[in-house]
C-alpha cells in the first residue's frame, strides 16, 4: 500500500474512535435519563433489567470494537512508519500525529464509565436520587 493511502486510513480510525466515545457517552447518559424519568424502568423491574442488560451488551461490544479499531490503527501506523523511514525528519514529525491511543488508557476509561452508568442506575433504583 502506498504511503499516501495509509494516512487517510489512519485518520479514519482516529475519527471512528472519537465518534465511538461520543456514542458511548450518549448511550450511557440516555440509560441514566430513561431510568430516572420512568420509574417502571428501575432495576427492580423486568424492563429496568432489560434496559441495563442492553446497555451492558452494547458497552461490551463497543469496547471490543474499539480495541479492534485501535489494533488496526497501530498496524497502519507501523506500515506508514516503514514507508517513510527513508526520511527520518518526516518520520519524527508525523509520529505523534499517527500514534494510536494506548489500550491501557481506553479500557480503564471505558470500564469506568460503564461502571458509573450501572452505579447510577442502581442508585436511582434505590430511590436515593428522588427528591422528597
Residue ranges, per PLM feature:
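Cytosol/matrix-facing amphipathic helices and coiled-coil assembly/linker segments
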Residues: 1-38, 87-90
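Membrane-interfacial loop-to-transmembrane-helix junctions in polytopic alpha-helical membrane proteins
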Residues: 3, 7-14, 40-47, 95-105
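Short linear interaction motif-like sites in intrinsically disordered regions of transcription factors
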Residues: 22, 44, 74, 106, ...
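Alpha-helical transmembrane segments
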Residues: 24-31, 54-67, 116-119
Amino acid at each position: 500500500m502506498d504511503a499516501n493511502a495509509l494516512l487517510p486510513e489512519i485518520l479514519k480510525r482516529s475519527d471512528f474512535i472519537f465518534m465511538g466515545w461520543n456514542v458511548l457517552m450518549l448511550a450511557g447518559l440516555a440509560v441514566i435519563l430513561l431510568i430516572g424519568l420512568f420509574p417502571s424502568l428501575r432495576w427492580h423491574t423486568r424492563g429496568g433489567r432489560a434496559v441495563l442488560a442492553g446497555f451492558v451488551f452494547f458497552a461490551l461490544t463497543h469496547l471490543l470494537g474499539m480495541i479492534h479499531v485501535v489494533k488496526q490503527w497501530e498496524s497502519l501506523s507501523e506500515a506508514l512508519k516503514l514507508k517513510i523511514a527513508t526520511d527520518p525528519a518526516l518520520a519524527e514529525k508525523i509520529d505523534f500525529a499517527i500514534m494510536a491511543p494506548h489500550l491501557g488508557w481506553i479500557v480503564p476509561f471505558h470500564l469506568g464509565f460503564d461502571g458509573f452508568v450501572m452505579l447510577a442506575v442502581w442508585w436511582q433504583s434505590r430511590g436515593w436520587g428522588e427528591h422528597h
